[in-house]
From Swiss-Prot:
PANTHER family referenced in this protein's UniProt entry, alphabetically: FAS1 DOMAIN-CONTAINING PROTEIN YDR262W
Keyword Signal set for record: yes
Stretch forming the signal peptide: 1-16
Phylogenetic lineage: Eukaryota, Fungi, Dikarya, Ascomycota, Saccharomycotina
Domain FAS1: 84-248
Species per Swiss-Prot/TrEMBL record: Candida glabrata (strain ATCC 2001 / BCRC 20586 / JCM 3761 / NBRC 0622 / NRRL Y-65 / CBS 138)
Keyword Signal: yes
PROSITE patterns according to UniProt: FAS1
Alphabetical UniProt keywords: Signal, Vacuole
Protein name, per record: FAS1 domain-containing protein CAGL0M08734g
Length: 253
């Protein structure tokens, strides 16, 4: 089957809660298609404060995420000063994370957790540069969208595959904070991303490695165990954002 050659035309640009911004275009045969808009088409970010859930977090009853508990042999009881901000608002204002933030907003369940004052999350956020360096865009893998198009898959099946790819990518970078997670002898902690926990209901194993070297943290995927330095840490009331110049999910991995 001959692959379709697509010609973009300015028909429409759509932004919705459940899908990434899409651009509508015609192929060379005149058939309409919807696909994710290139990064340069992206509109403004959602205002996290406008969508804030009404309740607030009680930090005395429910202390914020503390990565230090993973690397201590005894219980830690300390007060952590965190800004009056939640994950959704924090990630929306970090320009170095614009692309990941855009994808996360289109995984409704993950973004709801970012807004939830009762969440305890570790968000391992790839920089814009890390995502653009991938051989394929996050919406194009692990389900191969080009192959589906060439095979004549329906628009609905392709749109569902795109959404599932986005969910896979986002949740591969979101970890539920668990204080009782044990540290291995080499000082490494094995964590479960939301994507991993969805696929492994027995609660065993993990797919994300966290390590501390002095005052610095590093993270890796269990697939290659290549550690990447955490460039910045942003603490919020319901989690922390660890910025890395890499992705934990890659095409073909």
């Amino acid at each position: 089957m001959v692959a379709l050659k697509y010609v973009l035309v300015p028909v429409a640009l759509v932004a919705a809660k459940n899908i990434v911004e899409m651009i509508t275009f015609r192929d060379e045969n005149g058939k309409l298609h919807r696909r994710l808009a290139p990064e340069e088409y992206r509109g403004g970010v959602l205002d996290g404060e406008e969508s804030r859930l009404l309740q607030k977090r009680d930090l005395e009853m429910h202390p914020p995420v503390d990565l230090g508990v993973y690397f201590s042999n005894r219980p830690i009881h300390r007060t952590i000063d965190v800004p009056d901000i939640y994950l959704d608002s924090q990630i929306s204002v970090l320009t170095e994370l614009d692309i990941f933030a855009s994808y996360s907003r289109n995984d409704e369940k993950s973004y709801d957790m970012f807004r939830d004052p009762e969440s305890d999350l570790i968000v391992i956020a790839p920089t814009n540069a890390a995502i653009t360096a991938l051989a394929k865009k996050p919406w194009q893998f692990p389900m191969d969208i080009d192959t589906m198009e060439q095979a004549g898959s329906s628009e609905r099946d392709i749109d569902n595959a795109i959404h599932n790819n986005i969910v896979n990518f986002v949740r591969s970078h979101v970890v539920a904070y668990q204080k009782d997670t044990k540290t291995s002898k080499d000082g490494t902690v094995l964590l479960q991303s939301k994507q991993y926990s969805m696929q492994h209901s027995n609660g065993k194993g993990g797919d994300v490695l966290l390590k501390r070297e002095g005052e610095k943290y590093c993270v890796a995927s269990v697939v290659d165990e290549v550690f990447h330095d955490v460039q910045n840490i942003y603490s919020t009331k319901n989690g922390v954002i660890l910025v890395i110049d890499a992705t934990l999910s890659r095409p073909g991995a």
